[in-house]
Amino acid sequence: MDAVKKPSKAYRAVKAIAEWQKTVWYPVLFAVAGFAAASFGWQAYVPLFYVMAVFVVLSALFCDDIKVMLVPVFLAYFSIGSDGALDTTGHLLSTWNTAGLVNMIIAGSVMGIAFIARFVRDGLVRDVFTRRGMLSFGFVLLLGAFLLNGVGSRYWQPLDLAMGLLEGASLALFYVVVLAVSNHTKGLCAYVCRLCLICGLMICAESWLLIGRLGAAGELFWPENGILKRDNITLGWGVANIISGTLVVLIAPTMYLTYTSRYSVFSYISAVAMFVTTFALNSRNAMLMGSIILVVSIIICLFGKNKTINRLTTLSLFCAAALVVIVTFSVIGFDSLPAFFGRLLRTSDADSGRFGLWQSGLRDYAGAPVFGTGFMHGAEVTPDYNAFSRFYHNMIVELLGATGTVGVLAFLVHIKGVFEICIRKFRVERLLIGLGVAAVIMASMLDNFYFYINMQLFYGSFLALAEVQLEETRAALLASHKRVEAGRKPRVVFTFVEAGMGHIVPEQAICDAFEKKYGNVTEVVRSRFYAETEDEHMKRFERGFVDAVKLQSRSRIFGKLCILGTKLAGNALSQQFVMKMRYPDSKADGRAMRHLRELNADVLFTTHWATAFYANKLSAKDGNRPYTVMFCPDAYSNGMFDIDCNDFLIPTKVGLAKAQHRRMYAGGRGTVVPYPIRGEAFALRGKKYELRRAAGIGDDEFVVLLADGGYGMAKLERTVEELLALKADLRIIAVCGKNEKGAERLRAKKPSAPTRLDVYGYADNMLQLVCMSDVFVGKSGANSMAEPTFFGMPIIITKCITPIESGIKKYYTKIVGNAMYIPDPAKAARTLADMAAHREKAEPYIYRARWCAGEYGADKVADLIYSRVVEITDAPPSDEYKVISYE
């Protein structure tokens, strides 16, 4: 047998480099090269950028950890070198040697191509477009507002569109990139924070070397007043304000490592070094905002697992700083303190022209309050050096002046999501990452930082990290459910919540199936969660759900407003509002939590998100957090179902795909299950004519069944009236549910031959009525669509009360194909009359119902629930699961 050929030495060397790139020394070496490239002209930055490009290509081809590709993302920009002082007054290209600039662009392009190629290869580009984050909606709104900047203003120009696209896309770019990377790696938060620390130290080194050079050349201070020549402090990628602003943004993620890492002293000193460098750069904005960020970060780090060493480090640094101040002013004299602070704060240039810029921005907003005057118009009190020189140097004024009310509203929706990520299931580590986001916003109150790509890099990345950390927290909480001790029957609680019968009916079917199959090995509890306590607050709360459904039945606008409110406020805030903020309904919250503890569920099953909301509030320390299984009966879930649960079940593949696209149910399993139709439905299959004869209905009659859910409050009456007016040869069965007045009005009508009319109120034999009918007509409720489809019936949908029901309508009309959407009662009646006269027209819909719908039945759902019971049981609850030893 031929020997297996060993890899060549070159290949082994390349693989060794790829493995080395996964260590912290790769970004350290990259930063050292970046420091040299940024500091020593084209003779350094040209070869070093090509070396960086080689390393990026190697990592793209051979490294198996995708997060390594973030090294050039965070460090390459701050490695840009120059051959002269950065010129921002309209002659930007004069900063570089032409050949050097061209080569730097080529090397940078190689890095970019390698990065994109790796993203495509690993499927991250697909993730960007198929997995939506919590902030995606807000970023899309901002992009739309930025694209519309200046529309309708007399100052608008095509460049405004280009600038809006650039700003909106770059603002969201790094958020989606880092979020996509998180799907393919682990330990991302700590890794990115280490990159921030390394980047900050690299910038500090670049800054201090530049300051030293300027000092040696006598170009650091003005000789007449000793004030720093800040215009001379420029690197290839930024002026003093931008350099110092970047350092401020990097303080918080560096302090994240101080809070979490065992090398906390090093990261602590590094953060202080970044802050001290802002003083050396003499940026008042950075000194002010950096002080706030650093002090808050220090206070946070005085607690937690590293609190002892962090407190000692704080005390040591405070003493060292005090000693330096005392010695320094002992030498130069304490009487020089006022003059020193005057030079440091540049009191002679108090506002640096900011007030005039802000007044100009507010005037522009007053003249174009809807979409603003556009990014390219800008303040009229500054020279037009470059695209940013006429920005208003305050992000709120910039949003007002350039994008108008539309931009501000989009930002408010976005920032609401930012707050939600930072405070939802609060963790201190996430707060430190959020402080990095806050640093960008705070620093942008006195500058244009929010609109600079280097700041957008960190802004988007930190938001993605905060979301990743939130998902990790949610997953950890889900994993903290209680287990079933050996020798005890697992307690499975089915909670019934009335918010339309579409939640009740499928849960009854699942509970019946589970109790029949596994009732002997588990303790099954049927809980009418709100009603059984006899607590008036609990009863009123459930009535609120019912009333909301009825109101949505009467007013489609109300339903759309509910969904719009959820989109704008976000899922978590919407849930909090419904469950805890509506007085007096909010009084039910405490009693509901107590009742959930009283139920003492090992496994909690629900078809309504309310009880899952309560279960999700129980902590691991509570010792009573159940394993939660939630079934959404709709074709597509909505934001209110975005409750963390251990198992999320839905009856359609498209519904699960959409839920996963929205990154819902972090940490929980998502499963497509058969629709849990009631068990007696299977016994009725094939008995259509037997049931008809028992009801006195002829075999050849064309029977139309109309029902509008449990409350009967859609278009049933109008459709019946239109059918009666046509005098078609058919039988109408109208089921009015709990709408007793509607039933009375229909019973009072006298149909003319050959039309027959049977009117029911709330029908306990609904499945029999469905089975004996030829076509179903009504609103697109989950159960209302599933049962006729099970019996192979065509469906005419006359109303979609909410966007949820619009999704159900879409599923049955477009995917299953057995339904038609005819919202006009008169047209629906004509279609039914035509179908009664030409019954062959129903055949395609019958075929689609029989062959294109998914599976049905509650047994598989019951089996899934029991499999979860076995998973969380320390000793399986049945002899059937005993482990046999063959030793």
Predicted regions and their residues:
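N-terminal signal-anchor transmembrane segment
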Residues: 18-119, 148, 440
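Aromatic-anchored transmembrane helix interface
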Residues: 100-109, 133-146, 156-180, 195, ...
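Alpha-helical transmembrane segments of multi-pass inner-membrane proteins
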Residues: 147, 170, 189-220, 236-303, ...
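Flexible juxtamembrane loops connecting transmembrane helices in multi-pass membrane enzymes
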Residues: 228-233, 309-315, 326-360, 380-383
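Transmembrane alpha-helices of multi-pass inner-membrane enzymes
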Residues: 252, 294, 432-443, 449-479
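Long extracytoplasmic/lumenal interhelical loops at the membrane interface
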Residues: 345-403
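Hydrophobic transmembrane alpha-helices and their immediate junctions
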Residues: 403-441
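Donor-nucleotide binding loops and adjacent catalytic segments primarily
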Residues: 697-772
